[in-house]
Amino acid sequence: VNWVLVNGERETGVTLHYMVENADAGDIIARRKIPILFDDNAYSLYKKMEKESVAILDENWPLIKDGKNNRIPQDLSRSTYFGGRKPEDGRIDWKRKNIEIYNLARAVTHPWPGAFCFLRQKKVFIWQCKPLPVDGLSKPGNLISFDQEGMLLATGKGSLLLKICQLEGEEEVNGYEFAQKYSLRKGEFFT
């Protein structure tokens, strides 16, 4: 689930297949494509995939029981595998494009460990954000402004509106409350 969001994919899917010794290598019984919406995050996409997985099994179980289901051999040369993600993979590099940081944040939001950066040598989690086309206002990681919508930070290309943030060990708050609570000023750098 995480990798398709990190990579900015627009579609994923679920596959019902036979179990064999190698992971995900068994004959395919059925598969379904699932569109990935711009606002989807890891949790919402997981729930979509869960729903489709139940539906695909419900539809195919009678055929499986009767031995009348499809058995399409997989072309393993076309398979792609991505390794597991580790919490440190959630570290934000502000030099990246705003859309890449957005994709990372939505890929590792709750219930996963979260995208994070540092401010004043303290870990800050970014739970919800939004890419904006505002560009060239400052160096990557620089706090450009904040208002009721959140905190606007410069990225390598474009900017990112931080909507829900959390200083490690503290409660989650909206970006504006975060800026107020920690007396942030324009020009501060997130690293």
PLM region descriptions:
Residues 1-82, 86-88:
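Donor/substrate-binding cores of folate-linked one-carbon enzymes
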Residues 59-118, 125:
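Active-site-lining helix/loop region of Rossmann-like oxidoreductase modules
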Residues 94-191:
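An anion-binding loop in the catalytic cleft
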